[in-house]
UniProtKB/Swiss-Prot annotation:
InterPro entries: CinA, CinA_Arc, MoaB/Mog-like_dom_sf, MoaB/Mog_dom. SUPFAM superfamilies: Molybdenum cofactor biosynthesis proteins (SSF53218). It comes from the Archaea. It comes from Saccharolobus islandicus (strain L.S.2.15 / Lassen #1). CDD domains: cinA. This is Protein LS215_2186. Belongs to the CinA family.
Length: 263
C-alpha cells in the first residue's frame, strides 16, 4: 500500500484526566483517513508549554504530510497552543491582522469590548495564516513548514470540525492522489482465534489492512465484524479488497461460519 502519513495532537488536561472523551481525535482521524491519509499517531498532552512544544517537535521530526491539533486556542491562561507551536517552529508570536480583524468583527457585532484576553487569540506564530472559524471566535492556525501542512484547531468540537473543513477546502497542499476504501464481512459461528491464521496470510499476501472485531464472547456464540481496508489507486484497491473478501469467505465456509448481512 501507498502511505501518506498524518499525525494528530490533542491538547488538554481534561482529556488526560478522563473528564472529556477525545471525540475530536476520532473525527479528525476519520476525516483524514477519508482523504487517503494514514493516521500514524495520536498524541495527547496536557496544557503545559513544554509538553506542547515537545509534541509538535517530535511530530515534525517524523515528517508526516499533515499534522492537525485540537485544543488550546482560547483566551484563558492555560490556552498555550499558539505559543507552543511557535516555539516548536523556532519563531515568535505576532499579532496577525487577519485573525485580529476576524475576532474584532465578531465582538463588535455584539457590542462587546476587545480585552487583552480576547486579543490574545489573534497572536499566531510568525508566517502562519488564520483559518476562519464560522462556529466560534478563535481562528484556526495554519502554517506550511518543511513540506508539512500544520493546522491547529480549537477544542470545541463544532468549531474544530468547521476549521478543519475550511482548511481542507482552502489551504491543504499535500492532497493524496489515493483513495481510501473499506468493506466489511459479518460472520457468526467462527472464533477470532480460528480465523487468525487465514487473516495473517492474507495480510502478508496482499499488503492490506484486515481487522477482526469480536462482537461477543468467543467461547459461547462468536460473532465477528471483519474490516478490510486500504489506500491506493481506486481501481487497484477495489480489486484487492474484492480478492481478499472472496478468500476470507472461502475460509469462513471451511470453518462452518454463517455469513450475515449486518450485525
Amino acid at each position: 500500500m501507498d502511505y501518506w502519513f498524518a499525525e494528530i495532537v490533542t491538547i488538554g488536561n481534561e482529556v488526560l484526566s478522563g473528564k472529556t472523551v477525545n471525540t475530536n481525535a476520532s473525527h479528525i482521524g476519520r476525516r483524514l483517513t477519508s482523504l487517503g491519509f494514514t493516521v500514524r499517531r495520536i498524541t495527547v498532552v496536557m496544557d503545559d508549554i513544554d509538553e506542547i512544544v515537545s509534541a509538535f517537535r517530535e511530530a515534525i521530526d517524523r515528517k508526516p504530510k499533515v499534522i492537525v491539533s485540537s485544543g488550546g486556542l482560547g483566551p484563558t491562561w492555560d490556552d498555550k497552543t499558539a505559543e507552543g507551536l511557535a516555539k516548536a517552529l523556532g519563531v515568535n508570536l505576532e499579532l496577525n491582522k487577519t485573525a485580529f480583524d476576524m475576532i474584532l468583527e465578531k465582538y463588535t457585532k455584539r457590542n462587546i469590548p476587545l480585552t487583552e484576553e480576547r486579543k490574545k487569540m489573534a497572536y499566531l506564530p510568525y508566517g502562519a495564516m488564520a483559518v476562519e472559524n464560522n462556529e466560534g471566535i478563535a481562528p484556526g492556525i495554519y502554517i506550511y513548514h518543511n513540506n508539512i501542512d500544520i493546522l491547529a484547531t480549537p477544542g470545541v468540537p463544532r468549531e474544530m470540525e468547521n476549521v478543519l473543513e475550511n482548511f481542507i477546502n482552502k489551504m491543504l497542499r499535500n492532497k493524496p492522489n489515493l483513495k481510501y476504501l473499506e468493506d466489511f464481512i459479518y460472520v457468526e459461528n467462527v472464533m477470532e482465534s480460528a480465523l487468525a491464521p487465514y487473516v495473517k496470510e492474507l495480510v502478508k499476501k496482499y499488503d492490506i489492512y484486515i481487522k477482526t472485531h469480536p462482537k461477543s464472547y468467543e467461547l459461547l456464540r462468536p460473532i465477528l465484524e471483519i474490516q478490510i481496508a486500504g489506500s491506493g489507486r481506486e481501481e487497484e484497491i477495489k480489486v484487492k479488497i474484492e480478492k481478499v473478501k472472496n478468500e476470507l469467505l472461502d475460509a469462513i465456509k471451511k470453518l462452518n461460519g454463517i455469513i450475515r448481512n449486518s450485525l
